[in-house]
């Protein structure tokens, strides 16, 4: 057995794994050499595997699977098969722009070297074969030519994930994915494509035959059903022909009936015309007599009209005289009325004179009764002086009140601004608390309890750090959140252990809330300065230490400086990131931040060299909302001071208001006294003015004296003259009235004559009207008959046209003989024709939904039935041929397949027997004819007390499935020859007993002569395993500084082993 250590990369070192020999025992296509550069964990590494079993052992994360990835990708494998990353660029070592994988494959005519160079920038690969540029297609053709199948789970299960996928395959999937692709040849193992095609075509043909037969049956049934419709259609047509003939005859019968009526009416019309002429001859004399009477009547009416004109003229003159008399009466009344008005005016004048004298007398008495007013003016002057002094005091008070009011308004505005600012602070804090409530409800409930019970603690207690920390710039919140773990971000900070125990007893023990607490140190770590000023680090892009980016209460800041050294962790920019290697070497910083990453450096315990790691920063979640507690407290203090000032101003304003009310009362008293004095002076002046005015009015009334006797005499003379004029008018009126009476008598006599003539005229007109009425009635009867005659004539013409149209005849065309013959067999009256029409229509209506297309469809369907019958017979012959072909192909396919599965079963059973277990493999199907559902069934039994059970993802344990799957793959591998096989950590999950048995089988199988090259990758090994001389063991260590195997002290190893054995005993 050969062993060679495999060490992880160091920068700049080249690793050689294995021995560069063994070419004589290699199978064509085996791997001679694997070279990797900037690939996954390796800077540069070259592996030389042995021809038989190559066991690669190393701790997790050392790079074992990187060798498997190199084999898959170097042989044109897809990244999806590896299941590690979807883009090939991700397989290049971090920080490098390109890398490559190179594989040398053994070939008798000359080894083949395949190189894949991977570019990170464009995620592309460049291929080389024997150091010459090639295409992916050329590589994909070259690899299968060496019998290498990269995507085949049989030679390369590759990873535990792919191995688990294989273990979870169903019977049918196992058959298709393994036997079809990985064992035997297509001719004697896989379900031949031809039998699947024949079976599919046979199914399609059988389905087509079945559908055609069903379709033919439906056609026959439908045609049989429509046969009755055809017969009914012909019955309907016979009824319809009779209806058409009745509809043709009916207009001719209507025409004949109307023509007969026309002849009868034409005869009656001649009789009425003769009688009308006779009555017109008798009416002429009466008309002449009426005209003579009307002439006499007109003469008398003219005379009556003349008398009426004369009477009207006379009456008009009488009316005129009566109007003149009425006018004279009005004039007399006006004179009398004027006399009465003057008498009343004189009486009123005398009354007013008496009243005015009485008023003057009373006012003079009141004026003489008023006291002397000489002492009023000094009192008035004193009142004015006091009034001016009060006004000055009130103005001063108002000025002071205005100043205080303005000052108070300013303070109110400031008070409102401060209150709004506090509200803004509270809103921001509420946002932080709401976020805390959503994500950590227990911590939030503890915060609520703390606010209500702060008096229970002796020292200061700070809320969770995420609430207490306030960023100076929200953009820097991500640095603080990435630096402080979330458990501390949501932790309460105490200054004493005693307070913390009180809090935990209440919150954790009683309320069962899950909260974190920390106790700030007593030493003043928050006051410590960084070892190096930030100015010294600005050349590297650093702009601040972490502590300077936020504010927090002293206990919180003290704890953060103590626990997380926030005062010594600098924050940089993209400039820092671009020169990070220089920063790490020159600054000796243990932690630092760039724009988007956090870097941590430490010294290796082996080499004392600096080792750095970096992580990308997560986005801030809690500290994006900033609340400055000190500023809020300042605003609260300012608000209290403003409220105190407002209270002082209100007290001063109340005092001034009381003084102002006292001055107002004194002012009202002075105003009332001044008003009283002024009213006394005003009243005296008014009395004097009134007396003077009334004396003037009295003088004017005494001067307006009137002589009533003279006025009476003038009125009497005026009335006397008017009475003389009235007497003359009455005399003229009487003469006119006599003349009007004479004319009225003459008019009455003429009216009597006119009445007698009218009576005679009415008698003659009555006789004339009677004759005229009789003549009119006869004329109306004649006109009605004449109109009826014309109507019947037009009706006859219309009916004749209609009858000809019904028979499709021209204006001068005679009725065809066949129509006349058909008409003779039909009824002659309209009632009989209508009755027969209704009967035939009723019968025809029983055949609804029938058209000529029914007959056409019936004929077409009959023809289609013949065609479908011929096609069905033809397909049945084809189906029989397919059955014969499938039977022949089945015999050629199924027997070799059963033989192959028997061989697999022999190998599988042998492997299980060597483990004192039972295993079987057989060909299984539910239905013999469903060839695409043939599957390989694997049944296993691990305990003697159980039965054989099919291998499924649910029945066996994970270790039992791994063992079964591995042995099944080994059974397949005995039948499938390939250059090399790879298994990666398949022993994970196996119990020690099965793992040992499987390992021994792998060693035994892989180390036989003429076997394929084998790569067995594992992170662990059991003790006291059986190894073979032909094995090659490759150890992969976690660094380049491990002791070389040539320098191992084997004697010391043996001594330690003996001591361990002695302790175990």
Curated annotation (Swiss-Prot):
Alphabetical UniProt keywords: ATP-binding, Cell cycle, Cell division, Chromosome, Coiled coil, DNA damage, DNA recombination, DNA repair, Mitosis, Nucleotide-binding, Nucleus, Telomere
MF annotations from Gene Ontology: ATP binding; ATP hydrolysis activity; single-stranded DNA binding
Protein location: Nucleus; Chromosome; Chromosome, Telomere
Coiled coil: 210-439, 629-797, 855-893
Location of the region described as Flexible hinge in the Swiss-Prot/TrEMBL record: 438-628
Keyword Cell inner membrane: no
GO cellular component: chromosome, telomeric region; nucleus; PML body; Smc5-Smc6 complex
Keyword Coiled coil: yes
Binding site for ATP: 58-65
A biological-process GO annotation: cellular senescence
Domain notes: The flexible hinge domain, which separates the large intramolecular coiled coil regions, allows the heterotypic interaction with the corresponding domain of SMC6, forming a V-shaped heterodimer.
Family per record: Belongs to the SMC family. SMC5 subfamily.
Record function comment: Core component of the SMC5-SMC6 complex, a complex involved in repair of DNA double-strand breaks by homologous recombination. The complex may promote sister chromatid homologous recombination by recruiting the SMC1-SMC3 cohesin complex to double-strand breaks. The complex is required for telomere maintenance via recombination and mediates sumoylation of shelterin complex (telosome) components. Required for sister chromatid cohesion during prometaphase and mitotic progression; the function seems to be independent of SMC6.
Subunit structure and binding partners: Forms a heterodimer with smc6. Component of the SMC5-SMC6 complex which consists at least of smc5, smc6, nsmce2, nsmce1 and nsmce4a.
This protein's name: Structural maintenance of chromosomes protein 5
């Amino acid at each position: 057995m050969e062993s060679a250590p495999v060490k992880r990369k160091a920068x700049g070192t080249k690793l050689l794994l294995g021995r560069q020999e063994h070419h004589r025992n290699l199978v064509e296509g085996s791997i001679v050499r694997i070279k990797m550069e900037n690939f996954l964990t390796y800077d540069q590494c070259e592996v030389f595997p042995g021809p038989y079993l190559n066991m690669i052992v190393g701790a997790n994360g050392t790079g074992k699977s990187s060798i498997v990835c190199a084999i898959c990708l170097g042989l044109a494998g897809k990244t999806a098969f590896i299941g590690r990353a979807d883009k090939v660029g991700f397989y290049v070592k971090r920080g490098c722009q390109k890398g490559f994988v190179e594989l040398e494959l053994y070939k008798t005519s000359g080894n083949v070297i395949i190189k894949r160079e991977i570019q990170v920038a464009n995620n592309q690969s460049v291929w080389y074969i024997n150091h010459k540029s090639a295409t992916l297609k050329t590589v994909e053709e070259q690899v299968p030519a060496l019998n290498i199948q990269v995507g085949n789970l049989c030679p390369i299960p590759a990873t535990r994930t792919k191995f688990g996928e294989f273990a979870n395959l169903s019977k049918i999937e196992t058959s298709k994915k393994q036997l079809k692709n990985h064992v035997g040849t297509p001719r004697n193992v896989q379900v031949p494509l031809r039998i699947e095609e024949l079976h599919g075509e046979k199914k399609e043909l059988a389905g087509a035959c079945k559908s055609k037969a069903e379709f033919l049956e439906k056609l026959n049934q439908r045609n049989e059903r429509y046969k009755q419709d055809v017969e009914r259609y012909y019955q309907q047509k016979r009824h319809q022909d009779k209806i058409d003939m009745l509809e043709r005859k009916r207009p001719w019968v209507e025409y004949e009936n109307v023509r007969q009526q026309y002849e009868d009416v034409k005869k009656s019309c001649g009789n009425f015309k003769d009688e009308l002429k006779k009555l017109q001859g008798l009416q002429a004399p009466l008309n002449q007599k009426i005209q003579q009477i009307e002439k006499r009547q007109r003469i008398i009416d003219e005379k009556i009209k003349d008398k009426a004109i004369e009477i009207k003229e006379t009456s008009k003159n009488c009316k005129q005289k009566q109007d003149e008399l009425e006018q004279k009466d009005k004039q007399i009344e006006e004179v009398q009325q004027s006399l009465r008005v003057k008498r009343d005016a004189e009486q009123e004048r005398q009354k007013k004179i008496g009243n005015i004298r009485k008023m003057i007398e009373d006012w003079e008495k009141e004026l003489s009764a008023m006291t002397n007013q000489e002492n009023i003016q000094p009192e008035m002057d004193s009142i004015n002086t006091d009034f001016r002094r009060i006004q000055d005091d009130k103005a001063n008070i108002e000025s002071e009140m205005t100043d205080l009011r303005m000052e108070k308004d300013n303070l109110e505005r400031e008070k409102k601004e401060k209150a709004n600012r506090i509200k803004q602070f509270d809103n921001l804090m509420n946002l932080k608390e709401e976020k805390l409530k959503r994500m950590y409800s227990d911590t939030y409930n503890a915060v609520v309890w703390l606010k209500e019970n702060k008096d229970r603690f002796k020292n200061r207690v700070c809320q969770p750090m995420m609430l207490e920390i306030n960023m100076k710039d929200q953009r820097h919140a991500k640095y603080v959140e990435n630096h402080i773990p979330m458990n501390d971000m949501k932790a309460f900070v105490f200054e004493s252990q005693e307070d913390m125990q009180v809090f935990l007893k209440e919150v954790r023990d009683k309320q069962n809330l899950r909260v974190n607490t920390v106790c700030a140190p007593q030493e003043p770590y928050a006051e410590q300065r960084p070892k190096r000023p930030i100015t010294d680090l600005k050349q590297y892009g650093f702009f601040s230490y972490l502590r300077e980016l936020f504010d927090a209460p002293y206990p919180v800041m003290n704890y953060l400086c103590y626990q997380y050294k926030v005062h010594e962790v600098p924050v940089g920019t993209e400039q820092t990131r671009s020169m990070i290697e220089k920063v790490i070497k020159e600054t000796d910083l243990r932690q630092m931040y760039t724009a988007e990453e956090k870097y941590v450096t430490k010294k290796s315990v082996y080499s004392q060299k600096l080792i750095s790691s970096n992580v990308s920063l997560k986005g801030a979640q809690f500290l994006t909302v900033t609340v400055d507690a000190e500023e809020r407290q300042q605003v609260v203090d300012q608000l209290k001071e403003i409220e105190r000032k407002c209270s002082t101003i209100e007290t001063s304003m109340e005092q001034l208001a009381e003084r102002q009310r006292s001055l107002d009362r004194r002012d009202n008293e002075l105003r009332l006294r001044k008003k009283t004095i002024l009213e006394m002076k005003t009243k005296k002046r008014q009395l004097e003015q009134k007396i003077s005015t009334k004396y003037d009015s009295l003088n004017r009334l005494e001067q307006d004296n009137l002589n009533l006797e003279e006025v009476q005499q003038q009125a009497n003379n005026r009335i006397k003259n008017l009475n003389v004029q009235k007497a003359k008018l009455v005399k003229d009126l009487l003469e006119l009235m006599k003349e009007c009476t004479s004319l009225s008598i003459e008019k009455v006599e003429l009216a009597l004559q006119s009445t007698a003539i009218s009576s005679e005229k009415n008698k003659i007109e009555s006789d004339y009207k009677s004759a005229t009425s009789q003549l009119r009635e006869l004329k109306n009867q004649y006109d009605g008959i004449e109109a009826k005659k014309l109507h019947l004539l037009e009706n006859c013409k219309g009916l004749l046209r209609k009858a000809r149209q019904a028979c499709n005849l021209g204006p001068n065309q005679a009725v065809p003989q066949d129509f006349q013959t058909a008409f003779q067999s039909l009824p002659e009256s309209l009632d009989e024709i209508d009755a027969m029409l209704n009967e035939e229509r009723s019968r025809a209506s029983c055949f609804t939904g029938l058209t000529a297309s029914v007959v056409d469809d019936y004929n077409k369907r009959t023809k289609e039935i013949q065609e479908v019958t011929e096609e069905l017979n033809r397909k049945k012959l084809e189906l029989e041929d397919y059955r014969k072909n499938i039977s022949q192909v089945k015999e050629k396919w199924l027997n070799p397949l059963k033989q192959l599965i028997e061989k697999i079963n022999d190998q599988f059973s042998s492997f299980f027997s060597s483990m004192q277990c039972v295993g079987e493999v057989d060909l299984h199907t539910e239905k013999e004819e469903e060839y695409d559902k043939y599957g390989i069934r694997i049944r296993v039994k691990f305990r003697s007390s159980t039965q054989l059970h099919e291998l499924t993802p649910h029945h066996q344990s994970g270790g039992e499935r791994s063992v079964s799957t591995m042995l099944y793959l080994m059974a397949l591998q005995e039948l499938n020859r390939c250059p090399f096989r790879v298994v990666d950590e398949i022993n994970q999950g196996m119990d020690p007993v099965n793992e040992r048995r499987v390992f021994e089988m792998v060693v035994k199988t892989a180390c036989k002569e003429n076997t394929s090259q084998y790569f067995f990758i594992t992170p662990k090994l059991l003790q006291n395993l059986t190894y073979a001389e032909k094995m090659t063991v490759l150890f992969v260590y976690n660094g380049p500084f491990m002791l070389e195997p040539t320098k191992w002290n084997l004697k010391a190893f043996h001594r330690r082993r003996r001591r361990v054995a002695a302790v175990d005993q």
